[in-house]
Amino acid sequence: MAQKFFSAEWAKDALEVERAASDQIYKRFKNPAGFTHVLALEVADHPGVVTHIQYDQGRSVTWTTDLFDEDQVWARFSANLDAWRAAAEGKAKASNLVMAGRIKLTKGAMKDALENAAPFDRLVQTFGGVETNWEI
C-alpha cells in the first residue's frame, strides 16, 4: 500500500529500503566511520512535512517524523515535492538539484554537502523503492 511521502509509515518503509542499500551508501561517504549525524529532509511547499534520518558511523539507525532537537541536526535539505519526486524517480540526481537550487541546503556547510554528494544521491534514490503516495 502506498504511503504518504515523508509520513511516519513512509519513513519506516524508507528505512528498510535505505538499509538494503546501506553498503552502497556507506562506501560513498567521504569518512563513513565519522559520519554520525542527523539529516533533516523537508518539503518546502508543504510546511510541516519533515523527516529526520540519523546515521551512526555511516549507517542509518533511525528514520522518523518524531523530530530531533534542532541542535542535533547537522544538515537540512528543503525542496518542493516535485524536486524530491524527480530525484526519487531517477529523473535527476539529488546533488545536481542542490547545485541548481531546487533542493536547498538550509542548514550545514555546502563543503560537507559536496564531499558527501554521492551518498546523498544514493539515499534519495532509495525513495524510489518505497511505494509512495505523492498526494500529500
Language-model features: locations:
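Feature captures hydrophobic
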Residues: 1-136
